[in-house]
Regions:
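Nucleic-acid nuclease catalytic cores
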Residues: 73, 86-114, 118-198
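Basic, amphipathic N-terminal segments that precede the first structured/catalytic domain
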Residues: 81-84
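Charged, glycine-rich intrinsically disordered N-terminal tails and low-complexity linkers that flank
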Residues: 1-78
Length: 198
């Protein structure tokens, strides 16, 4: 295990350029890449992409389909700072932005952008924070610190790329943080990680 490689800073980058970097690296020299949201598709648990679709996209045989939920995705992106704010306030952890595009030290195809990073107030240990939002009818997926499997794969992949031991989600679905916010945490699990990278 080793620290990740910082490939580039995505601050101010256009969406098209960001997508190019995610697909082939900033120099265009990586034949194919895997990102955190791809992992669920590889394992067949993504609600949005099948393993075959992902393979065809990565091999250049198919263009990504326009997302039916493009407005929801945009809204989720816009709400990330709110999810990060409430996580910081409720957990006491120091949360900060990191606009880097990172590459796994041992698996050059594995790239990651993190929603946020944090340092634990209890011991200063670093972690990766994934910021999510959902509708009320999806809130039960987060009940009792549950994590939807497709998101768990994503965060476990990010922990591996970042080479850190802790991760957390901040997911909200309403305007009352006392009842409408879930903040489940996970610890790095090398057995599960090996499943992802084998």
């Amino acid at each position: 295990m080793a620290a990740p490689i910082l490939l580039c800073d995505t601050t101010g980058m256009s969406n098209d350029r960001w997508l190019e970097c995610r697909m082939h690296g900033p120099k265009g020299d990586i034949p194919y890449t895997i990102g955190g949201s791809d992992v669920a598709a590889i394992f067949g648990v993504s609600p949005w992409t099948t393993p075959l679709e992902l393979w065809m996209i990565k091999r250049g045989r198919m263009k990504p389909k326009p997302k039916d939920n493009a407005d929801q995705l945009e809204m989720g992106h816009l709400l990330e700072p709110i999810a990060a704010y409430w996580y910081a306030k409720k957990s006491g952890n120091y949360v900060y932005d990191d606009k880097g595009l990172y590459q796994h030290a041992d698996h050059p195809y594995a790239l990651a952008n993190f929603d946020r990073r944090y340092e634990r107030a209890s011991d200063g240990q670093p972690g990766i924070l994934e910021c999510k939002s959902c509708t009320y009818h999806k809130a039960e997926d987060w009940a009792d610190d549950a994590i939807p499997l497709y998101y768990e794969f994503q965060l476990r992949f990010y922990l591996a790329v970042a080479d850190v031991q802790h991760g957390a989600f901040s997911c909200f679905w309403g305007n009352n943080p006392a009842n409408d916010l879930a903040m489940p945490e996970i610890k790095r699990d090398l057995v599960k990680e090996d499943m992802i990278f084998d």
